[in-house]
């Protein structure tokens, strides 16, 4: 089961994609269950309600071909990001691997659909890509007792691109990275939200391409701090609400390494995470 939101920006409708007995996938309208895929929906055990309706045959089919897909979670109250969570990415950035998670934030209005047009910010010369595993919180998480308990607060997972402007992030930052992370549309999410029970978050292949040429190719098994640890750790410092998104870091292979040019108008970035779907952004100048 994969949850999606489709339609024009700000007017997305909920749907669910499921495998039929004949081995083919079909999309079903989820509006009999919920108006949207929100934190409130997740907190009310919405994933279980969606599965019950799907299994009962209560959902009409819907055609998604030709439809714009939005981010599969609406209006997260927070986007919490983990920096340098892959040792080789830390090395290519000129940093030692962290001994505790490095945390920064992106503003919620950076969220975009997986294939929406993306923009090089004004005055940018170093716009970069970052394929990342996104974690969507399903239950309020505060002062959790263990990583094992933290696992029960995760609704599901999605593909994310933590777009970044490196001059804004580093030279202009004053030590805080968010300046380089919060340009409009800098958090494409999706295409799907896959329930946590269907995902082995510790062994997923992540890849990215620019203009069809490979850039990143790694696995979440290489994360320094795994997902359950991160959710538990973060809960000791802040309260995560249902629908909030954690971006868990990116592997090596970004332009910051010096091995590849930064993005420019006309470039095409594609990212993919095993089982969670593929994104495609065409870049224009803001």
Q: Each predicted region: which residue ranges?
A:
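Short catalytic-site patches enriched in acidic/histidine residues
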Residues: 102-121, 141-142, 185-192, 251-255, ...
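Short acidic (Asp/Glu) patches
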Residues: 61-68, 87-89, 97-98, 112-123, ...
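Non-heme Fe(II) oxygenase catalytic core, chiefly the N-lobe of the double-stranded beta-helix
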Residues: 109, 113-166
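N-terminal non-catalytic cap/leader segment that marks the start of a structured domain
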Residues: 1-101, 268-272
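Catalytic-pocket segment enriched in acidic/His residues
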Residues: 5-10, 62, 68, 89, ...
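Residue-level recognition of short, solvent-exposed, well-ordered loop/turn junctions
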Residues: 74, 81, 128-130, 241, ...
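Structural signature of FAD isoalloxazine-binding scaffolds in flavoprotein oxidoreductases
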Residues: 97-114, 127-129, 265-275
């Amino acid at each position: 089961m994969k949850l999606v939101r489709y339609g024009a920006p700000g007017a997305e409708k909920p749907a669910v994609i499921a495998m039929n007995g004949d081995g083919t996938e079909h999309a079903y309208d989820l509006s009999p269950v919920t108006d949207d895929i929100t934190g409130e929906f997740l907190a009310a055990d919405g994933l279980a309600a969606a599965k019950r309706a799907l299994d009962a045959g209560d959902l009409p089919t819907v055609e998604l071909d030709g439809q714009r897909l939005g981010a599969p979670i609406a209006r997260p109250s927070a986007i919490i990001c983990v920096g340098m969570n892959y040792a080789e990415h830390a090395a290519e950035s000129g940093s030692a691997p962290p001994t505790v998670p490095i945390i920064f934030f992106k503003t919620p209005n950076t969220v975009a659909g997986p294939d929406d047009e993306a923009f090089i910010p004004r005055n940018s010369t170093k716009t970069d890509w970052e394929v990342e595993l996104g974690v969507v919180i399903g239950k309020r998480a505060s002062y959790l007792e263990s990583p094992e308990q933290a696992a029960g607060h995760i609704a599901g997972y999605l593909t994310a691109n933590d777009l970044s402007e490196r001059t804004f992030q580093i030279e202009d930052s004053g030590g805080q990275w968010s300046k380089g992370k919060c340009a409009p549309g800098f958090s494409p999410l999706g295409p799907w939200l896959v329930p946590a029970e269907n995902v082995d978050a510790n062994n997923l292949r992540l890849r990215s391409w620019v203009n069809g040429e490979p850039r990143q190719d790694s696995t979440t098994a290489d994360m320094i701090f795994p997902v359950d640890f991160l959710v538990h750790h973060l809960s000791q410092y802040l309260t995560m609400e249902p629908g909030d998104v954690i971006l868990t870091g990116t592997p090596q292979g970004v332009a910051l390494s010096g091995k590849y040019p930064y993005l420019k108008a006309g470039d095409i970035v594609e990212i993919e995470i095993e089982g969670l779907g593929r994104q495609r952004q065409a870049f224009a100048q803001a």
